[in-house]
Amino acid sequence: MSHRIVLPRLMEVGAGASGRLARVLQELGCNRPLIVTDRMMVELGYVARIAGQLEEAGIASQCFADTLPEPTAASIRAGVDMVRQGDFDSIVALGGGSPIDSAKAIGILGKFGGEMRDYRFPRDVSEAGLPLIAIPTTAGTGSEATRFTIITDETSDEKMLCAGLGFMPIAALIDYELTLSLPPRVTADTGIDALTHAIEAYVSRKASLYSDAQALEAMRLLAPNLRAAFNEPGNRAAREAMMLGATLAGIAFSNASVALVHGMSRPIGAFFHVPHGLSNAMLLPAITAFSIPAAPERYADCARAMGVAAQTDSVEVANDKLLAELRAINQELSVPSPEQFGIARERFFELRETMARQALASGSPGNNPRVPTEAEIIDLYETVWNQE
């Protein structure tokens, strides 16, 4: 049995990689880029720095900086209009997962038209949009190396998973120095998101030897460095490990898919505006406990790769240590419960069935080692609400 592996054509990795943008554009034959980003990147001066580098190389750029933290079909519309009305030959995505996801959608809609819901899973979007160069500024989503984008349909409060080669960046510039200014909360949420990607890719029913290698190495990089990056924002070694780990985790899940945590996380984010990484963190311990009986050896491998279990530990002991570590990470990194985040219990329980249906419809739960029924997902939402 063969497995299809999809990657960016070109990746620059390491300190200062973002400074290679002009050269990369030239190598790709692009000279009229639209920079897609958010207001924070403008305020931090990152956009001016990159635009200045391009100008020095004789490349004129424009900027769309109105992406939202959890992008909606409406929030990207102005960017799509800019592409349709302009003469751009490429898109540069600068920021965390949300600007990169927005840029992916803008590149496809700007070239082919239609509505975002037209491209939702299970459609396989193989059409090539505008060439996309991704420059991540968080160590989390791995979106710079994935063939997915997540956009919320604000008319139904559904986070739509869109997948296909058309959403894969042609190039990624992975510069950990851009993460040195991240606040602890963002570091924690994006870091746990990356760890979730690695774990879910490894236990996915679509996993392969290739994705396994990326996922295990991602866990080896992420787990020992997450606390250091959270507690010591200027720790360059920890930041570098987190950035590379997040990208490897992105490569892993882009080729093996994510599973139940992500399937259940998207409705929480859509209905209650919980940041994606944070909703994953809320779910990860409970979903892992639910899933371990169906793939105990795979989860034990995760515990060993993360450095919390020894090679000599039994599978059962390793999995106990894995669950203890996931709970400890949430506690030490101050991950709130749904109630502590501010979600009303009545509303959460009222939406359980709708969230369960949306989770199943996304397709991600079908990749889980233990594939849940709708009733089991409803029960798991209750478990997450009631957990200490």
Per-region residue spans from a language model:
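C-terminal charged capping/lid subdomain of soluble metabolic enzymes
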Residues: 299, 303, 309-388
